[in-house]
Each structure stands twice: as structure tokens, then as C-alpha cells.
């Protein structure tokens, strides 16, 4: 059975972390970077989340250009998994495909559409009133 840590980024820069397992985790399996998931999977009813990335149990980042869920060694000029220090530097890096699988441990997501209640209300946060 898969279990994930889902990190949901808000427009204001706040990030919320959720532990997801069981049936809720199955809603993510088979989805790829750029696809949307119902917010009920992480306890945010009425919200819609877009998968923006993630990583596997070894820390390999998900790469949107790699189909499937397998690992691949790519020659990277920069971007996901490698930040060059000099112009023209390239490096072979191992990345995970764009599809969420049982090997995925962390999923990054952003909010596409909001529900009626605020996230703070849903999570039991304190009001500043």
C-alpha cells in the first residue's frame, strides 16, 4: 500500500504538508505532473490540486519530460535535478518519470481552485480576530 507526503503550495507562499495513505493515496497513483486531483484526498473538500512535482524514496526528483514512473539517466544542462555552476556544463543525472507510482514518497501540488472554506478553517487554524 502506498503512502505519500503531499506538500500543497498556496499562492501566498504558504506550504501545507499532509500525510496520505490508503484509498486517498490511490487517487494519486497513475497521475502525472500537470494533472489535477480532488482536494478531498488530502482533507481539503472543494479544492482542486495540480501535481507539480515530487520525489521518490531515494530523493530522485520527478521530471516532467520522462514518460512513465521508471527512473532514467538523462544528460541535463540544468533544471530538475541539476544546477550548473558554469556556462555549458552538463551532467548525467538520474531522475524519476512524471507519473506518480508506489515508489513516490513526496508529491508537490499547487491549488488550482479553492473551496468555500479557507484552508486555515479546514485545518483548525486560529483566526486573527
Swiss-Prot record:
Keywords: Ribonucleoprotein, Ribosomal protein. Disulfide bonds: none annotated. Residues 106-129 are annotated as: Disordered. One of its GO terms (biological process) is translation. GO terms for molecular function: structural constituent of ribosome. Pfam families: Ribosomal_S6e. Transmembrane segments: none annotated. InterPro entries: Ribosomal_eS6, Ribosomal_eS6_arc, Ribosomal_eS6_CS. GO terms for cellular component: ribonucleoprotein complex; ribosome. It comes from the Archaea. Belongs to the eukaryotic ribosomal protein eS6 family. This is Small ribosomal subunit protein eS6. It comes from Natronomonas pharaonis (strain ATCC 35678 / DSM 2160 / CIP 103997 / JCM 8858 / NBRC 14720 / NCIMB 2260 / Gabara) (Halobacterium pharaonis).
Amino acid at each position: 500500500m502506498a503512502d505519500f507526503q503531499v506538500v500543497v503550495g498556496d499562492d501566498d507562499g504558504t506550504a501545507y504538508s499532509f500525510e496520505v495513505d490508503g484509498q486517498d493515496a490511490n487517487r494519486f497513483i497513475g497521475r502525472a505532473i500537470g494533472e489535477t486531483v480532488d482536494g478531498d484526498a488530502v482533507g481539503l473538500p472543494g479544492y482542486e490540486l495540480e501535481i507539480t512535482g515530487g520525489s521518490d524514496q531515494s530523493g530522485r526528483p520527478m521530471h516532467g519530460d520522462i514518460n512513465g514512473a521508471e527512473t532514467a539517466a538523462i544528460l541535463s544542462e540544468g533544471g530538475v535535478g541539476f544546477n550548473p555552476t558554469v556556462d555549458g556544463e552538463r551532467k548525467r543525472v538520474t531522475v524519476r518519470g512524471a507519473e506518480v507510482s508506489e515508489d513516490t514518497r513526496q508529491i508537490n501540488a499547487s491549488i488550482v481552485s479553492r473551496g468555500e472554506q479557507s484552508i486555515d478553517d479546514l485545518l483548525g487554524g486560529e483566526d486573527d480576530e
